Each structure stands twice: as structure tokens, then as C-alpha cells.
Amino acid sequence: MTAAEAPLPPLAPRERTATTAAERRTGSPLAVSLSGVRKSFGDKTVLSGIDLEITRGEFVVLLGPSGTGKTTLLRLLSGLEPPDGGDVLVPRQRTVVYQEPRLIPSKRVLANVSVGQKRAQLTRDNARRALAEVNLADKERAWPATLSGGEAQRVALARALVREPELLLLDEPFAALDALTRLQMQDLVGDLVARHRPAVLLVTHDVDEAVRLADRVLILDNGGFAVDVDIDLPRPRDRNDPEALRYRATFLAQLGVGRPSSTRQDIS
């Protein structure tokens, strides 16, 4: 098993004795809790005491300028990067889908989906169901080299789903896809998340993607969250809806697009 397919290391859960604000807001159990989390690399502070709660079934999108710590936060939640301080609560069942599908070239599609899983026959059955969910039931005998970029990324999604994660981490999974395939993948991910109900954290630079998919958008800047706002729009979402355009314009302004960074605005 390669490092890309190895199970994520467990983090010891922390006891909780009270219902959190996030649980009261969404009505779902808490999946992620960060309290006062800090992370630095040398003299550069990336995360300076952040707090974050995500509940089961909540789709959170993380935006931010390059170098602000988005991928560091995702790696911290996956267990691949230790915090320098603070408390971390994440579920043991969690998985990551990256920008590159990271399929094993020497294994067929079905074997890629079931890699690392035990109980071979049950795993194959589950892998076939996962492939059907991503509309690749006819590709189980295919080799990775024969797949398009979108198909390979769907295999990576199926591999994540077969593990039944309570937390799904998405690290710019659509960034390398063409515009049409990107929209199709966004719709597919939205449908799969609605069906399986994991907590989701999607890291992206695409504001339109955030407005299209998110229940909640965070913008990371200067070591903390400059924005933490719910997206209160019906689904499916029309990118030309006036409210969607308002969210888009506000997020772009906060990211410093189209105006000097000194005039970034807060939203409530």
C-alpha cells in the first residue's frame, strides 16, 4: 500500500459534555472541533489560535489567498500535520480526495477503489456500488491510464465513499478539470454528500464553486477566519440569482479581487 492509500492516522477524541453552537444551529452531531489551534513553520505563523466546528452533513468551503494555510488546515484535519497547540477533535473515519486522483497504475479501477480494505468479497461489492454511484459501473475492469481526467477523479471519489467517511476532505479536486467536467463533478459531489451526509471541508480558490456547493464559507487570512458565513440559498443554485451574485461579489472583495486589500469588507 502506498502512502496515498494508507489509512489516515487516528487522533484521540476529546470528551464533550455540552451541546455546541454548531450542533444547535444545524441540528446534526458534531464531526469536527478545533479550539485554539496554532501552527507555524519557522518564523511564519500560519494558524494563530483558530476555532472551528463542523457538523455531520455540513458542506464547508474554505477560501483564501495562496499561502494563507488552507492546505495546512486540511492536512491538520487529516492527521498528516500535527498542530503546535490547541485541541483537535476529528472522527476516525475520514478520507481525503486530492487534486490529483493518485490512482495506482498497476491496479484496475475496481481494485483501486477497494485498495486497503479488508474482507475481500464485501469490499468488492461495496466498491461496485460506489462505482455505480459515480456513474462508472462499466469501468471496473479498466486501467487508470485509459481514463479521462474526470473519470479518474470520479474513481478517487468512489474510493473515498467506499470507506463511509464521517469527514470528507477535498483538496481542490476539480482544479485540473475542464470547465464542463468541473461543473459536472460539482453536481456529482453535491449529490453524493447529500446522500451520504459526511461533514465536508472543500479547499478551493474558486468563489463560484464555493457559492454553488457550500452550506457555509470560510475565508482564511492572517492566521484566522476573516469570514465565516452561511450560504442561505435554495438548491440547485442559479449562479445568476441576485443573492448568489451578492455572495460572490462580497467574497471576491474580501479576497482583494477588484479593489485594494485595505478596503476588504466584513459580512455578517
Curated annotation (Swiss-Prot):
GO terms for cellular component: plasma membrane. Gene3D superfamilies: P-loop containing nucleotide triphosphate hydrolases. Residues 13-26 have a biased composition (Basic and acidic residues). ATP binds at G64, P65, S66, G67, T68, G69, K70, T71. GO terms for molecular function: ATP binding; ATP hydrolysis activity. Its EC number is 7.6.2.14. Keywords: ATP-binding, Cell membrane, Membrane, Nucleotide-binding, Translocase, Transport. It is found in: Cell membrane. InterPro entries: AAA+_ATPase (IPR003593), ABC_transporter-like_ATP-bd (IPR003439), ABC_transporter-like_CS (IPR017871), ABC_transporter_ATP-bind (IPR050166), P-loop_NTPase (IPR027417). It is a peripheral membrane protein. It catalyses: ATP + H2O + aliphatic sulfonate-[sulfonate-binding protein]Side 1 = ADP + phosphate + aliphatic sulfonateSide 2 + [sulfonate-binding protein]Side 1. Transmembrane segments: none annotated. Belongs to the ABC transporter superfamily. Aliphatic sulfonates importer (TC 3.A.1.17.2) family. The complex is composed of two ATP-binding proteins (SsuB), two transmembrane proteins (SsuC) and a solute-binding protein (SsuA). Part of the ABC transporter complex SsuABC involved in aliphatic sulfonates import. Responsible for energy coupling to the transport system. This is Aliphatic sulfonates import ATP-binding protein SsuB 3.
